[in-house]
Amino acid sequence: QDRHAMSDAALKAGYKEEYLIKTGLCYKRENGELIDRFAGRVIFPWFSLSGKVVGFNGRVLDSRTHGVMQKYVNSPDSEIYHKGNELFGLNQAKQAIRKADSVILVEGQADVISMSQSTVENVVAGSGTALTVNQVRKLHRFTNNITLIYDGDDAGVNAALRNSDLIHGEGMNVSVLFLPDGQDPDDFAKSHTPEELQEFIANNSTDSIIFRINRTLDGVTDPIKR
C-alpha cells in the first residue's frame, strides 16, 4: 500500500512535517523517509471528553492480519494524547453512563462499537486490559459502578483481578463478566439480539470480591481450608 499518501496530502495542504511527527501521524525512518503510521489500516479516532480528536488506533482487517506482527497500531503519546488518560468512546457514552449509573469496560474499539449498536451504550474501552488510576478517576466522575468484560483466558482473568483492586482503591463498585466459548463482546453482540445481550450482562455479572473468593476456593474440597 501507499505509505506516503496521507503525508503527501498533508504537506501539500500546508501542514508542517514536524507536527505530523509530533502528533504521531507519521514517523521518519533512519534514511529520512517520512512514513504514514496508519497506512493500510482502518482508523478508530480517540475523542477527548470535549469531543476533540486527540489520537488514533489503526487496525488491519483484511487477510494480511494473519502473520502481521502489529495487528493494532496506536498513536504515541503526544502533547494532546496520553494513552493512560484516555478511554475510547467515553465522550459518546458519558450521558448513557450517567443514566444507567454504570459503565462497562471492554478491551477493544470493535467491542465498544458492536455493543453500542446493540443498544448497550454505557460502554468504553481502554488499551486492551491496561488500566490506570487516571482512567478510573475519569470514569468515577460519571458513576460509582463499573463492570469489566474481558476475555475468559488466564490473561483476562488476571487482568480483571488486578484492575478490580485498582478500581476498589478509588472507592468504586466492581463486577466482572466473562463471555462463553471464548467470545469477545464484539462476537457476542453480533451473534445475539440486543435483548439477549442486555439480559446476559444483567444475569451473569459477578461482584469482583465474590469472584475472587470463588476463584480462590475453586477445587478446594477441605471444609476447614474453605
Enumerate the predicted regions with their spans:
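Phosphate-handling DNA/RNA-contact segment within nucleic-acid enzymes
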Residues: 3-142, 146, 159-160
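Conserved, well-folded catalytic cores of nucleic-acid-processing
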Residues: 13, 59-60, 142-149, 166-170, ...
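Hydrophobic alpha-helical scaffolding
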Residues: 79-83, 125, 129, 149-153, ...
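Amphipathic alpha-helical transducer elements in NTP-driven molecular machines
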Residues: 87, 133-136, 140, 156-164, ...
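Short secondary-structure boundary/capping segments
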Residues: 119-123, 163-166, 191-194
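Phosphate/diphosphate-binding loops
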Residues: 154-170, 174, 178
